[in-house]
């Protein structure tokens, strides 16, 4: 049972507390919106590059009594759009939940921002690997087409 207070009447105290919570929430949401807009600017800069290669880096590992997994930040196609995103990957249940960055859990967004430079480095590496792979396959296709053309001429 709560202790009896001899201060302001309860409704007045509750109203004051609610005003504080509302003001703090407004400030938090404004800061979070600005934060997410800046990540959106990175998306805007990446979009015309037309990379089309998914890439993820681990932000943190987690475990519970029945599961373990990791939280990641990445560049991938989420909801039909290439963007910076977040995902939580479960090792045991093999489930994966992903979000567009601005829609992900706030705690994950805050952690993930420290890994954006690493993500860009990894994305550059995967893009270079993709280029090498395409170049190799293109050479193979050129040989294949050349052989087919020679056979067709006979």
Language model regions located:
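Contiguous, amphipathic alpha-helical segments that mediate oligomerization or scaffolding
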Residues: 2-63, 122-151
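Arginine residue identity/basic-tract feature
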Residues: 5, 19, 34-37, 68, ...
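Generic signature of intrinsically disordered, low-complexity segments enriched in small/polar residues
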Residues: 21, 38, 78, 85, ...
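Amphipathic, interaction-prone secondary-structure segments
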Residues: 40-98
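N-terminal amphipathic/basic membrane-interacting segments and domains
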Residues: 65, 69, 94-131
């Amino acid at each position: 049972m709560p202790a009896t207070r001899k201060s302001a009447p309860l409704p007045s105290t509750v109203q004051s507390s609610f005003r504080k919570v509302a003001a703090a929430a407004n400030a938090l949401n404004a800061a979070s919106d600005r934060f997410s807009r800046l990540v959106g600017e990175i998306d805007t800069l990446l979009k015309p590059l037309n990379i089309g290669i998914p890439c993820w880096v681990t932000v943190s590992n987690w475990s519970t009594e029945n599961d373990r997994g990791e939280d990641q930040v990445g560049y991938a196609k989420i909801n039909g759009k290439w963007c910076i995103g977040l995902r939580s990957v479960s090792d045991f249940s093999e489930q994966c939940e992903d979000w567009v960055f601005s829609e992900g859990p706030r705690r994950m967004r805050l952690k993930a921002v420290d890994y954006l430079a690493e993500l860009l480095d990894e994305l550059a590496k995967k893009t270079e690997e993709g280029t090498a792979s395409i170049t190799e396959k293109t050479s193979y296709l050129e040989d294949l087409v050349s052989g087919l053309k020679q056979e067709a001429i006979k």
